[in-house]
Every structure is written in C-alpha cells, then in structure tokens.
Amino acid sequence: MRTIQHLVIPGGAIYGLSYYGSLKYLCQNNAFQMHNIKTIHSTSVGSIISTILALKFEWSEMDNYFINRPWHEVFKFSLCSIVKCFKNNGFFDISTIKDIFLPLFSAKDIPIDITMKEFYEATGVELHFFTIDVSNFSLVDINYESYPEWTVVESVYASSCAPVLFQPFKKNGSWYTDGGILANCPIKQLCESKINPKLDEIISITTEDRVGDTNKTYDKYNLLQYVFDLLSKIVNKIQPTYTPDKEFSRYEVIISQSLIPVYDVFSIVNSPQQRKILIDHGAELSRDCCSKILERNIDIIDSIV
C-alpha cells in the first residue's frame, strides 16, 4: 500500500491557519502520518507552516501555539512601523520570522540560526521553499541541497516576504520577494522535479480563485487589504484562474478564502477566536479528501485479500 510521502502547502496569508487545520484533520483521521513525510513543497505562509510541521510537535501543542500565543506582540503595528514601511519597503523584517520560530525551536533544542542542511539532518524532512529573485523575476527553489548554508529563518523569510507587509530579503547582492506571484501552489514544481513522486503519494492544499468577488466594495479596505487585493488580480493575470489539476495531484484540499479577507492581519493577530475559526475552516474542507484517501486504502486492502 502506498503512503502519503509529500505535502504541498501554498501561500495565502492568514489562511495558513486553515492549511494547518486541514493537515491536522487529515493526520488525525489517518489519511497520512508525519513520520512518513519525505518532502514538503511550500510558498509564503506555507513555508512557515511546513517548518513547524517538520518539528513534529503534538497537535495539541501546535493548537495551543497558534490559538493562544499573543500574536499582537509579534506583529506590532504602530506609527513607527508605518514610517519604517516607507523607508525600508515593508512593515516587518526578518526578526518577525525569528520571533515566530524562537519558542518552537527552543522547545526542540534547535538553534535559531540552524541551516537548511542541519535542519534536514535533524528532522529528516526535505523542505522546499519557493521565492522570487527580483533582479530577473525568476522562481528560486530553496532547499538543503541548493542552499545548504542558508539558515531556515532566511529561507522562510525569502519565501514569505510579501510586498508592503514585509521588507524584501537581501542576500549576496540579490533581493528576494514572496514566491506566491509565480508559484503560489508549487505542486507542478514537485511533480516535475527529480523526486518524481507518484500521484497517490501527494496531498496538495490549494486555494480557489484568488480574485474573488468582482462586485466587492473597497470602501472599508485598509492599505494592506487594498494592496494585496490588487496583487491578487495581477497574480491571476500571470497564473491562470485555478482549476483542479488532476495531472499533478490526486488528493487535493481546496481552501475557500471567502471566510475572512485574506490579508486582514490586524483582526487575526488580536483574536484567538478568529484564529480557531480559520483552523476549523480548514478541517471542515478536508473531509472529502480524507474520505478519498481512506477509501483508496480500503480498496487496496480488499484487492490484496
């Protein structure tokens, strides 16, 4: 019987919590087990989620971390941060990613400056983070083989530094920005890589149409919501509107982003209740995918018997 060995986790800002909720539901209902996972391909917030999953905490511990941590102390919005945004091309810098990971890394006795190669050796999970080299607007796959000496924090930040919200990542004379513009869901990159996975070894999470309702009103948008809605429309012109791609993925969870505006960071960092709603949203949308995987396993067992 084939087991799920590869996960694909996309970008999607606050909906990273829904991706986490989806994978928690699938794992707890025996669709896959983390100890069988060999690779995780991810972009933007998906890179944050994949790093945390690779640490293999108990689900109850991760629930407590995501829901009850005082996130407003990590993402601090103030007049000072607004001024810095104009000066430094973004509200937050790499120190925010360090703050996200520090308590988790410390709990596992992992140094915050651990390299990609060291992290692979410690966890056994091959992480692939996708970012964009701004100079030539090319997609870059950061992994332990291609960038072994980059730290995990640097690699995740390069993949996650969405324009305006985060400052671009600068290293070795190059600037990097959020990989979601060119590969928001890097399932194609996984399937066309040397890994050459079987279709029934992959669980892919993706999002439905990123543009959303064309009749929406902008009257109540804040700056971040306006900028990222505009970016979503640009991305949609670069990448075709999403349709399920059975050529690349047999087991897929499609996360609707209609529950809360995708870049409503302000309300999410201040509300444990809203964070739990997003996690439960992901779990609810995973039921069909879970049933497909379990039915497949039953059919295989029946055929063997």
Question: Model-predicted segments: where are they?
Answer:
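Patatin-like phospholipase
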Residues: M1-T43, T51-V305
